[in-house]
């Protein structure tokens, strides 16, 4: 059955021809693939199913020849193109015309207005840059479906995401699309899922605190369900929850501890499966002084009491310097310390301390005999390691170091991370930290040496290095110097011109003698070094700047599932920019993973990312400063502040021109606009004042490091 519904007989030649058409420049056997496809044909088989079958056969052959893997992705991409509309506007119109529209009114109207320029800039050939498994992942969960049938192409999705982030600014949208479609970066999964939709929840990471009460516990569980429903990954810290056997004053009873509560979290994660696209995921963070620590370490194990198991949760520990110091002493043969466990109800405050303050309070409670129990620290450590070996968790984070190097010291103590343990932000039961993420693809930022000038190579017939050098060059003029006397004259001439002794071939020169722009390369080894690919740091910095603008937009456009998330994001405006493809990059640069050059490159990469992001963040703040320091803004802000004086300042935003301002930003502006010290920071996020960066401390300062590749201009 063809894609248009017409029935016809299957012909081997047609199957083979389709395979052959898609196998340009591939070393594969179209006949073999066609034979295997035809051997599995049944009555009523659809053409699209034949393509699926052919792609699966190719993937089974890719271990013998990697070109079959390339053919597999060409087949599935071609099949997707045959099943979907090549017009972006028509595809979006289809999504919008559903009974419950899949894209927002704002996005649809923006597309209608810019239809022609959008269609002109979309490039469907870039779909073929995605491999088989990449496309299948996108097809399964990311590309929009109607009645179970995929209607989007990869480029449709990328353009939708870009337009959804930059409604009203077509140039910024097309620039963002260009970067994404060329695979310089990708946005986080929720952004790809929901950008441009009616409920655009675009954030990946949520960090949640829990209050030790029935209302607090079940509110947190409900909030986790709402966040998970919209594809958010969650980290919850539960140190404040009292332990098993702890007294409950309200009922004159005893607490059952954290495990029964965690079982509710576990079932919630299983039930609320992110809109059917992927499983809900929650990580639970605990400090090792909690009395339920031993039971906590067992919850993911495959044996034991089923009532004590929560295998769909991830576990994590926030370890202190004190714990690690006592552990180190025990491992190195000192007296083994009996680690004390304290109930949060009887011994409050430990989870809100770090460093020396934590140590002081810990020993204060210990001396007051408030410990619920004590356990040899080596025994506890072995329990932790055993759990990691068996289940892969708990994650281990170091609370003191996290807080020492935090730019949120002016806000509070960081007590947990997120689901994947790469984001550290302040959170409590009043504000849930969240972060919008994006990932830069380093492997797509490699520059190959492009030789577009004349190349002259002096060689001799029986020279293996000459032959090897010619294989490296795309084009060249070969000057064969087999005569020994002629070679001696050549060596003398080159030695005179270059001011150094030349006594071997090959010798490679690039350029035009007439224009006198000849560049001497050298021999075979020098040519290899000359042609070596390099990393494009300029592209890296430009990518960072595009991402900062995009993620800043995400904060304002996002649909927040609960007000605590909005409060946190509007106050702190955190951005999470990371990398992928590091090993692929090293392979392309021909750098060993453990080499000194790799270590230096790693540092240089992250220095460039850090400073480029800071620079663009500063530029955004300056743009806002220039808007906020006008007389017109002062009049507008005064009216807004007076009219909404009873509103929560961190939950309400107002649009002025193309920018959005929270009521808190407006209040800060009105309070400090004439203050010579704080007034200059108007335009920054509201909790910037008092932060380490506000006081001139960069992240590397907090780590007691200095930049190695970028000049510190302070």
Stretches with model-predicted labels:
Residues 482-503, 527, 531:
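Thioredoxin-like thiol-disulfide oxidoreductase module
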Residues 294-295, 467, 471, 492, ...:
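Alpha-helical elements of the RecA-like P-loop NTPase motor core of helicases
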Residues 1-449, 532-714:
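Extended catalytic cores of very large enzyme megasubunits
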Residues 392, 450-481:
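Local sequence-structure signature of Cys/Sec-based thiol-disulfide redox active-site neighborhoods
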Residues 142-143, 507-509:
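Residue-level detector of beta-strand face positions
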Residues 510-533:
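Non-catalytic, surface beta->alpha helical segment in thiol-disulfide oxidoreductase systems
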Residues 5, 457, 463, 472-473, ...:
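Extracellular/surface recognition and adhesion modules
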Residues 8, 254, 459-462, 483:
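Amphipathic alpha-helical protein-protein interaction segments
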């Amino acid at each position: 059955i063809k894609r248009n519904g017409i029935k016809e007989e299957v012909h081997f030649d047609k199957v083979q021809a389709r395979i052959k058409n898609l196998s340009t420049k591939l070393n594969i056997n179209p006949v073999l693939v066609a034979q295997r496809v035809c051997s599995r044909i049944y009555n009523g088989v659809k053409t699209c199913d034949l393509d699926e079958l052919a792609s699966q056969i190719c993937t089974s052959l890719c271990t013998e020849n990697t070109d079959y893997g390339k053919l597999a992705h060409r087949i599935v991409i071609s099949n997707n193109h045959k099943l979907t509309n090549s017009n972006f506007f028509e595809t979006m119109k289809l999504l919008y015309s559903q009974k419950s529209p899949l894209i927002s009114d704002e996005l649809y109207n923006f597309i209608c207005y810019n239809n022609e320029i959008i269609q002109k800039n979309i490039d469907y050939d870039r779909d073929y840059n995605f491999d088989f498994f990449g496309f299948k992942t996108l097809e399964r969960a990311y590309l929009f479906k109607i009645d179970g049938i995929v209607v989007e192409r990869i480029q449709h999705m990328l353009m939708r995401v870009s337009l959804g982030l930059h409604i009203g600014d077509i140039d910024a949208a097309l620039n963002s699309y260009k970067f994404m479609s060329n695979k310089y970066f990708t946005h986080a999964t929720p952004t790809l899922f929901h950008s441009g939709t009616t409920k655009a929840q675009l954030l990946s990471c949520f960090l949640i605190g829990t209050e030790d009460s029935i209302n607090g516990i079940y509110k947190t569980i409900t909030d986790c369900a709402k966040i998970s429903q919209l594809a958010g990954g969650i980290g919850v810290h539960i140190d404040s929850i009292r332990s098993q056997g702890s007294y409950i004053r309200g009922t004159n009873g005893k607490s059952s501890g954290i495990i029964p509560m965690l079982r509710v979290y576990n079932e919630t994660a299983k039930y609320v499966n992110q809109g059917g696209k992927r499983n809900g995921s929650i990580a639970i963070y605990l400090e090792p002084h909690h009395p339920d620590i031993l039971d906590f370490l067992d919850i993911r194990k495959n044996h034991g009491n089923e009532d004590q198991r929560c295998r769909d949760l991830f576990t994590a520990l926030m370890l202190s310097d004190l714990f690690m110091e006592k552990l180190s002493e025990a491992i190195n043969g000192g007296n083994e310390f009996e680690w004390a466990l304290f109930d949060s109800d009887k011994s409050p405050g430990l989870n809100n301390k770090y460093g020396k303050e934590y140590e002081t309070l810990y020993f204060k409670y210990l001396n007051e005999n408030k410990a619920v129990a004590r356990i040899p620290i080596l025994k506890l450590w072995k329990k932790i390691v055993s759990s990691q070996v068996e289940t892969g968790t708990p994650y281990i984070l170091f609370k003191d170091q996290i807080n020492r190097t935090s730019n949120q010291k002016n806000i509070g103590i960081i007590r947990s991370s997120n689901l994947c343990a790469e984001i550290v932000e302040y959170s409590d039961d009043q504000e849930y930290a969240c972060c919008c993420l994006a990932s830069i693809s380093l492997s797509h930022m490699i520059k190959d040496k492009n030789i577009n000038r004349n190349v002259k190579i002096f060689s001799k017939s029986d020279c293996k290095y000459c032959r090897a050098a010619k294989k490296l060059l795309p084009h060249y003029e070969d000057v064969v110097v087999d005569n020994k006397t002629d070679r001696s004259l050549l060596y003398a001439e080159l030695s005179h011109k270059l001011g150094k002794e030349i006594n071997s071939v090959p010798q490679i020169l690039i350029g035009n003698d007439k224009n006198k722009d000849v560049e001497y390369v050298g021999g075979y080894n020098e040519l290899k070094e000359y042609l070596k690919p390099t990393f494009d740091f300029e592209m890296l910095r430009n990518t960072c700047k595009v991402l900062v603008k995009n993620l800043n937009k995400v904060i304002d456009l996002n649909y927040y599932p609960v007000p605590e998330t909005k409060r946190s994001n509007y106050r702190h405006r955190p951005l999470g920019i990371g990398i992928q493809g590091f090993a692929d990059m090293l392979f392309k640069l021909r750098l060993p993973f453990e080499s000194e050059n790799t270590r230096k490159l790693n540092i240089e990469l992250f220095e460039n990312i850090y400073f480029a992001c800071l620079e663009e963040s500063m530029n955004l703040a300056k743009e806002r400063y220039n808007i906020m320091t006008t007389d017109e803004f002062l009049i507008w802000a005064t009216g807004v502040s007076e009219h909404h004086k009873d509103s929560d300042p961190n939950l309400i935003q107002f649009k002025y021109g193309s920018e959005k301002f929270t009521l808190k930003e407006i209040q800060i502006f009105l309070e400090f606009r004439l203050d010579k010290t704080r007034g200059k920071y108007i335009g920054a996020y509201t909790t910037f004042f008092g932060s380490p960066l506000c006081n001139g401390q960069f992240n590397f300062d907090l780590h007691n490091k200095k930049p190695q590749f970028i000049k510190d201009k302070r």
